[in-house]
């Protein structure tokens, strides 16, 4: 039986009451957002004839999502993070701003307070038995294309099991393992020694993967390395690079892959290269330069204020 009541005055009045629009006090912006979201959800219930059983299954799902702390995982999986990037790209295009280094999603696993050094850092603690040495380096350029000294380059990535320090369920990693902040040298360069990361998948029994299963989708990410780059007079850049050749590089469940952000890991076995890089054996090398953009009327209009773990 088809029931159509959404457009009745009773329902529209009720939406205003439920959203607090008829009450003094509260936050007007929150009221505006809740009214729109409630309206869209009520309309979806009517248009799709969502049953009470389906509705309460959804409520139970949200409870489980919160209990597992996976909202930050589901968000990129449903494309919300990428959509926000698309909106910022469109805003930049309207302002005539060209992003030589594309932005992409931050992800949920940044931790503030990583050890800081100038020019160079060793990121891994050397304890991963499967770790393959990686030398990652590049130059930070300013908005005019000149090397930028004193820029802050924050880098973080997973280990060979796909786990991040501070979020590793095995408890095997030390604090800030594979998390560092590097201040670029007088030539605008940064350099780190670390290990090649592995990609990861959503917890197979968790609510994110359960929903992806219903959508016929996998929950895998390719091997990747995260960046924040900031400098005086420039907008903070949030991006990440994917390791070329990973089977999920162009099939990332989080939709973070973008042209210009796929980097080859070049293998080196030459004894002279091994000696020059002060490593113990064969290693991989990745080179990634980044270019920043100027502030907009003195303001960083792309900085995102969101809850992040701080240690």
Curated annotation (Swiss-Prot):
Give EC number(s), comma-separated. Answer: 1.13.11.1
What the entry lists under CDD domains is as follows:
1_2-CTD
Please list the cofactors this protein needs: Fe(3+)
What the record says about family reads: Belongs to the intradiol ring-cleavage dioxygenase family.
Positions bound to Fe cation: 164, 200, 224, 226
Per its UniProt record, what InterPro entries does this chain match? Catechol_dOase_N, Cchol_dOase_prob, Intradiol_dOase_C, Intradiol_dOase_core, Intradiol_RC_Dioxygenase
One GO biological-process annotation of the entry reads:
catechol-containing compound catabolic process
Instruction: State what protein this is by name.
Output: Catechol 1,2-dioxygenase
MF terms in GO:
catechol 1,2-dioxygenase activity; ferric iron binding
Quick one: which pathway? Aromatic compound metabolism; beta-ketoadipate pathway; 5-oxo-4,5-dihydro-2-furylacetate from catechol: step 1/3
Supply the alphabetized keyword list: Aromatic hydrocarbons catabolism, Dioxygenase, Iron, Metal-binding, Oxidoreductase
Q: Which gene encodes it?
A: catA
Q: Which Pfam families match?
A: Dioxygenase_C (PF00775), Dioxygenase_N (PF04444)
Q: Which PANTHER family match?
A: DIOXYGENASE, PUTATIVE (AFU_ORTHOLOGUE AFUA_2G02910)-RELATED, INTRADIOL RING-CLEAVAGE DIOXYGENASES DOMAIN-CONTAINING PROTEIN-RELATED
Keyword Metal-binding attached = yes
According to its UniProt record, which reaction does this protein catalyse?
catechol + O2 = cis,cis-muconate + 2 H(+)
Q: Does the keyword Transmembrane helix apply?
A: no
Record text on cofactor binding: Binds 1 Fe(3+) ion per subunit.
> Which residues are recorded as binding catechol?
164, 224-226
